[in-house]
């Protein structure tokens, strides 16, 4: 394992950590970076590259689990009231998270092979980036015209299910899970922070499940020679995601979704021009 290969692992881990939970599409960015670094450089087989992506995604998942550790313990009944809303009898439940997960989980299971075969390209990512940006701009426009639910514990079952339906849009590479669900939550009456909190918590089980299935699928591609590459990528993804998630949650109610939408449109247009 050369220093150059470890540098590539670090870059890929950083890209994953920066984009996994920001509403800019980590899958889209990884497809772009994959074309530039992994495939063009022939660093590893396609199977091994897929396993690497799963490993660095697990680094990002661990970061979010740490940020939301109190909430997770509360959901599991291991920690009592952590907010004033819970003192008043309002509380986000595991059932609400579950109903939010169902739509995307079912569609993802049914169309996984089709999505992998036909939608994982730079062109489809560019389309997803622009389409998702339009949804985000619409969400911010709607948000200015209604009073929003400002805490996670006041989310209704109806809102949880509807946000889950919006998550189905993220099955299109480039659309972004957080972009679609935060936008959906805002359109449905949540403020940006509550929508982001629900998005990140809801993402953990579905991402862990998908990562586990993918890791099992590509298990034969793992080898001891690649372990340093995988470890560097995992650590970089974890550290960067830990910083990004905390920073994003602190600012999202102030900056809204417009800056991310502008970035997505610019990147999407550039990619489409390159593909012409």
Curated annotation (Swiss-Prot):
<comment type="similarity">
    <text>Belongs to the UppP family.</text>
</comment>
<keyword id="KW-0378">Hydrolase</keyword>
<keyword id="KW-0472">Membrane</keyword>
<keyword id="KW-1133">Transmembrane helix</keyword>
<keyword id="KW-0046">Antibiotic resistance</keyword>
<keyword id="KW-0812">Transmembrane</keyword>
<feature type="transmembrane region" description="Helical">
    <location>
        <begin position="119"/>
        <end position="139"/>
    </location>
</feature>
<dbReference type="GO" id="GO:0071555">
    <property type="term" value="P:cell wall organization"/>
</dbReference>
<dbReference type="GO" id="GO:0000270">
    <property type="term" value="P:peptidoglycan metabolic process"/>
</dbReference>
<keyword id="KW-0961">Cell wall biogenesis/degradation</keyword>
<dbReference type="GO" id="GO:0008360">
    <property type="term" value="P:regulation of cell shape"/>
</dbReference>
<feature type="transmembrane region" description="Helical">
    <location>
        <begin position="225"/>
        <end position="245"/>
    </location>
</feature>
<feature type="transmembrane region" description="Helical">
    <location>
        <begin position="255"/>
        <end position="275"/>
    </location>
</feature>
<feature type="transmembrane region" description="Helical">
    <location>
        <begin position="48"/>
        <end position="68"/>
    </location>
</feature>
<keyword id="KW-0573">Peptidoglycan synthesis</keyword>
<feature type="transmembrane region" description="Helical">
    <location>
        <begin position="92"/>
        <end position="112"/>
    </location>
</feature>
<dbReference type="GO" id="GO:0009252">
    <property type="term" value="P:peptidoglycan biosynthetic process"/>
</dbReference>
<comment type="function">
    <text>Catalyzes the dephosphorylation of undecaprenyl diphosphate (UPP). Confers resistance to bacitracin.</text>
</comment>
<dbReference type="GO" id="GO:0050380">
    <property type="term" value="F:undecaprenyl-diphosphatase activity"/>
</dbReference>
<protein>
    <recommendedName>
        <fullName>Undecaprenyl-diphosphatase</fullName>
        <ecNumber>3.6.1.27</ecNumber>
    </recommendedName>
</protein>
<dbReference type="InterPro" id="IPR003824">
    <property type="entry name" value="UppP"/>
</dbReference>
<keyword id="KW-1003">Cell membrane</keyword>
<feature type="transmembrane region" description="Helical">
    <location>
        <begin position="196"/>
        <end position="216"/>
    </location>
</feature>
<dbReference type="GO" id="GO:0005886">
    <property type="term" value="C:plasma membrane"/>
</dbReference>
<dbReference type="Pfam" id="PF02673">
    <property type="entry name" value="BacA"/>
</dbReference>
<keyword id="KW-0133">Cell shape</keyword>
<dbReference type="GO" id="GO:0046677">
    <property type="term" value="P:response to antibiotic"/>
</dbReference>
<feature type="transmembrane region" description="Helical">
    <location>
        <begin position="155"/>
        <end position="175"/>
    </location>
</feature>
């Amino acid at each position: 394992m050369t220093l150059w290969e470890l540098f590539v692992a670090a870059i890929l881990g950083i890209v994953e950590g920066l984009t996994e939970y920001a509403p800019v599409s980590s899958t889209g960015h990884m497809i772009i970076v994959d074309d530039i670094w992994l495939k063009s450089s022939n660093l590893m087989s396609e199977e091994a590259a897929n396993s690497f992506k799963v490993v660095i995604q697990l680094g990002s998942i661990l970061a979010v689990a740490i940020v939301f550790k109190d909430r997770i313990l509360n959901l599991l009944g291991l920690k009592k009231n952590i907010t004033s809303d819970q003192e008043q009898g309002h509380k986000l439940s595991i059932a609400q998270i579950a109903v939010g997960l169902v739509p995307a989980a079912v569609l993802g299971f049914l169309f996984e092979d089709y999505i992998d075969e036909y939608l994982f390209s730079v062109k489809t990512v560019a389309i997803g980036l622009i389409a998702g940006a339009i949804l985000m701009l619409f969400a911010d426009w709607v948000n200015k015209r209604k009073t929003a639910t400002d805490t996670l514990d006041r989310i209704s079952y109806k809102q949880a299910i509807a946000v889950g339906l919006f998550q189905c849009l993220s099955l299109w590479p480039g659309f972004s899970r957080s972009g679609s669900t935060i936008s959906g939550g805002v359109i449905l009456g949540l403020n940006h922070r509550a929508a982001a909190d629900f998005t990140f918590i809801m993402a953990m089980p579905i991402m862990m499940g998908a990562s586990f299935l993918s890791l099992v699928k590509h298990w034969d591609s793992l080898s001891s020679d690649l372990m340093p590459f995988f470890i560097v990528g995992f650590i970089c993804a974890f550290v960067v995601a830990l910083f990004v998630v905390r920073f994003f949650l602190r600012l999202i109610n102030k900056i809204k979704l417009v800056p991310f939408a502008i970035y997505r449109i610019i990147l999407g247009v550039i990619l489409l021009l390159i593909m012409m």
